[in-house]
Amino acid sequence: MNPAIEFKNVTKAFVKKDGDVQTILDNVSFSIPAGKTTVIAGGSGQGKSVTLKLILGLMRVDSGRIMVQGNDVTGVRGKGLESLRTQFGVLFQGSALFDSLTVFENVALPLRERTKKNEAEIRAQVLSSLSQFELDGHEEKYPAQLSGGMQKRVGLARAMQLKPAIMLFDEPTTGLDPVMSLEIYHLFARTQAEFGFTSVIVSHDIPKIFNLADRVTILNGGKMDVFSSPEEIQWSEEPHIQEFVKTTMGDIYQSDLVEK
């Protein structure tokens, strides 16, 4: 089986205001297994969100190739890019809900824009999704009337309408308290288990999310380290990994872990 996503010798750099070049990804190669959950971690400015934007075609690589489900999508544009994006569901830091639309209208949006379903079919599917994500009775509310956790649920429900093969989450629990964050991670785990999609999560909240992950990648200084267990990371002798554990993870064994 092909990996869901594969980077082959990908380099991406930016020119800063002072003229210096900052290399975010430096000849990086890695793969994301299909049907599994991969967490991308790293400090601020290390390229986590850039990696997601490259996957979605929102940025171009400077060199190298990106494969999605076995297809080379490097530099794809036009209808090819539109087709690529139908394979993804996305939930960014903010839920990206339209404030002027109700919960129902927000969730129905991809069905109205990208399918030929009639209104009766759309209504049936949306109401079923709202029930699945414990949003019954909220369909006529507006985003501003919902808590941060409820907004995340709406965003996830909308992202799932086209049944994507791959879900991308960019800091999905930003702004939520620890209890709500844990609840949202449990929701991700249940949804992934039910639908079987590939899940890519950019997060700094490693202690709570670790048991959700089949694989963890750590970005640092343009390079990427791949780990598959808490023990593997904690016992790494690489100085930058030790620093990551100290400043970001703490003692993950004493944290409230999400069970897969």
For the regions a language model picked out, list residue spans one by one.
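Catalytic Walker B motif of ABC-type/P-loop ATPase nucleotide-binding domains
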Residues: 167-170
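H-loop/switch region of ABC-family ATPase nucleotide-binding domains
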Residues: 203-204
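Conserved ABC ATPase signature
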Residues: 142-146, 150
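Conserved ABC ATPase "signature" region
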Residues: 72, 119-137
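A short, proline-enriched helix->beta-strand linker immediately N-terminal to the Walker B motif
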Residues: 161-165
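Helix-to-loop junction immediately C-terminal to a conserved catalytic motif
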Residues: 56
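A short, surface-exposed alpha-helical micro-motif characterized by mixed small hydrophobic
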Residues: 209-211
